[in-house]
Regions:
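Extended alpha-helical scaffolding segments
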Residues: 267-274, 278, 282-283
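Terminal, low-structured helical/coil segments at or just beyond the last alpha-helical repeat
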Residues: 283-318
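Extended, well-structured beta-strand/loop surface patches
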Residues: 1-54, 60-161
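A conserved position within tetratricopeptide repeats
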Residues: 147-154, 187, 191, 224-225, ...
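Alpha-helical adaptor scaffolds
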Residues: 160-271
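Long, positively charged, glycine-interspersed low-complexity recognition regions
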Residues: 239, 263, 274, 286, ...
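Acidic, polar-rich low-complexity tracts and alpha-helical solenoid repeat scaffolds
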Residues: 150-153, 266, 274, 313
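Short alpha-helical linear motifs
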Residues: 77-84, 276-278, 309-313
């Protein structure tokens, strides 16, 4: 029985070698088998902090017995293996430190540490691995461009996609003027617009991001009166107003929630308690905390100590 070949140094050669075929007299490992191993990027990226233009590249790896390994991105992505490798066609070389890895029987590529704007590509085989970090500059702008184009096709016939696009812009503080148009489309576009709590709240969020708070408040006054406005949605809006320091308006919202949802015996009382606390009416705040705690639902029992602490502070005059 023949001995099994070692992966690194035998199946995968070290350094650059003359493979005895093709035009290359000093070829790196093809980072795979048979045809050219390739990697494609739809947009410009950074590899280990270095710029690489969008496109498809031949991917090679200079494997060394000691020290760093080097990833090579070649402009030639069509030649067979590395038999015709030409360093003059290199688009980028990046040195990386190889690492010890959990045993992997088969050559494996994958992506780890995935985030919105970056990820790490890795190769693992046997007990070794090598990786490179990919960063996408201006990822939010790229995403908005994709969404803008998608809204011109079938996704554009669903109001929720317009709403989601506007929300993305608000969350990332980009493209706000167009986001306002998208939010309005979700509300009032012929055949697809839906005027409901969520679409109005989205428009208000865009207006707030544009520092048009007075207009946003008018939109939210309308939103909380929508049939789709739930107890929790209105309550959360009140909490948002509290966080913004608008205690008077927050109390008005909590009072409206209480008035329009008499069947609710907990959340609306919590809202009133917080609202009255914010405006300095301790008597009403204590009364509403006591009622809320008395009606505590099972799914809130984990927060009982927090509610009791709020009540205790009020009773102690703190």
């Amino acid at each position: 029985m023949l001995p099994m070949a070692q992966t690194w140094g035998e199946l995968v050669h070290y350094g650059f070698i003359d493979q005895g075929f093709g035009s290359s007299k000093a070829a790196p490992w093809r980072a795979g088998a048979n045809e050219n191993t390739t990697i494609s990027f739809s947009h410009d990226v950074k590899i280990e902090g270095k710029d690489l233009k969008a496109g498809t590249y031949g991917l090679f790896l200079d494997v060394e017995k000691e020290g760093n390994w080097t990833w090579i991105f070649s402009k030639n992505s069509t030649s067979w293996g590395s038999y015709f490798y030409n360093p003059g066609e290199d688009a980028l070389r990046v040195p990386v430190k190889p690492y010890d890895a959990t045993y992997t029987e088969f050559l494996t590529y994958g992506f780890s540490e995935r985030n919105a704007s970056n990820a790490t590509a890795y190769l693992q085989w046997e007990s070794k691995g090598a990786s490179f970090k990919i960063d996408v500059p201006n990822v939010n702008e790229l995403y908005v461009n994709i969404v803008r184009n998608e809204l011109r096709s079938s996704p554009g016939f669903d109001y929720q996609n317009w709403m989601n696009a506007a929300q993305f812009c608000v969350q990332n503080k980009i493209n706000l003027e167009e986001a306002l148009t998208w939010a309005e489309t979700a509300i009032s576009a012929p055949f697809l617009g839906q005027e409901n709590f969520n679409t109005l709240q989205t428009k208000a969020a865009v207006l707030n991001a544009l520092n048009r708070q007075a207009e946003a408040a008018v939109v939210m006054d309308k939103a909380i009166k929508m049939p789709s406005a739930t107890v929790q949605a209105i309550h959360q809006y009140g909490r948002t107003l509290l966080a913004a320091g608008d205690s008077k308006k927050a109390l008005e919202v909590f009072q409206y929630n209480f008035k329009t949802h008499p069947e609710e015996k907990f959340t609306t009382y919590v809202g009133l308690a917080r609202g009255y606390t914010a405006v300095g009416n301790k008597k009403e705040a204590i009364k509403n905390w006591e009622t809320a705690i008395k009606n505590l639902p099972d799914n809130q029992k984990a927060n009982l100590a927090l509610y009791e602490a709020e009540l205790k502070k009020l009773k102690e005059g703190k």
